[in-house]
Amino acid sequence: MVPALAVADALRAEGAEVTFIGGERAEAELVPAAGYPLRTISAEGLSRTSPLRAVRALGRAALALAHSRSLLAELSPDAVMGGGGYVAGPVGLAALTRRIPLVLTEADGHLGLANRALAPAARRVCLSFPIEGRHGKRYRVTGRPIPALGGDRASARERFGIAAHELCVLVFGGSLGARSINQAALDAFASGAFHVVHICGRRDYPELAQRPLPRGYDLREYLDLEDFADALAACDLVLARAGGSVFEIAAHGLPAILVPYPHASADHQSANARWMSRAGAAIVIPDGELTAARLAREVAELLANRSRLAAMASASRRLARPDAAREIAAEILEAAGR
């Protein structure tokens, strides 16, 4: 949802009106908070393990397609953008059946099920990474859209109570958090030798908040988009999963220690992590090899070697695609005849 909001902001800056069609999960909170109207449909992902759930999902998809066609008839958009996922499938198909130009975005290093089905008929498919076999004028590598960058480093550090001389490590693992990272970070960073901003997620926060924390250990359940951007601006090193946030890490020119989620679809987080590692911007630790001792050693060595930290930061910055949202917005406006 964050990439879609970034594109919406770029479209709005060009004078376009934007309406979201989504489900009733995160978008039900994020979209209205960002100032955009949201229309909802009922759909669910296609289960690959439960035949009963798969049949139910197909039934809901048929209803979602009919509902999507009705909404598009009412809204009469000049173009539709699909971001992949269980809602984008029926909405994208509805757009094609109504002959509305469709632009797709793919956040991962492979096309998801909905995008694979819709890509042959889409006006443009905007890719975060080059994907083997996806070439030609229909495909364009734009990078993954990210929110606007945070404020300047000095004000961001002041906001988080980080002294000018302190080094800061930012830890996060998605909205629910990442249990392996949460546990390893708390044990590895108990010395208080540097400042830590740790966004642990909803699932683990009640338990972790009961633990004694060293000075300078800032444990948070959640940060909104603006605060998260400031946290990135304030820190010197990131410890995180390797989802779409790798593009935000790169946009801020940050070195990273990445722990890919081992059960991600098509293992795309490992591919994301390799992308940063090959460029010299990240150290990759497989989830099964993450221990507090190894994490403490890796972080201590990095923070003690300022020249290596700076080289990784430069490599990260070279990977950045800060104009991705504007490039995708331009594709949508062109498809819409603007």
Spans of model-derived segments:
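Conserved nucleotide-sugar phosphate-binding/catalytic loop shared by glycosyltransferases and other
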Residues: 12-63, 69, 142-144, 202-204, ...
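Active-site-proximal region of nucleotide-activated glycan assembly enzymes
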Residues: 17, 25, 37, 96-154
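Donor-nucleotide binding loops and adjacent catalytic segments primarily
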Residues: 28-30, 155, 162-240, 270-274, ...
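A short helix/loop element that forms part of the nucleotide-sugar donor recognition site in Leloir-type
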Residues: 53-55, 150-162
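Acidic donor-binding loop of glycosyltransferase active sites
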Residues: 77-79, 233-247, 254
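C-terminal "capping" alpha-helix adjacent to the active site of nucleotide-linked donor transferases
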Residues: 285-286, 290-307
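C-terminal alpha-helical cap of glycosyltransferases
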Residues: 301, 321-338
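A short, well-ordered alpha-helix in the C-terminal region of glycosyltransferases
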Residues: 308-322
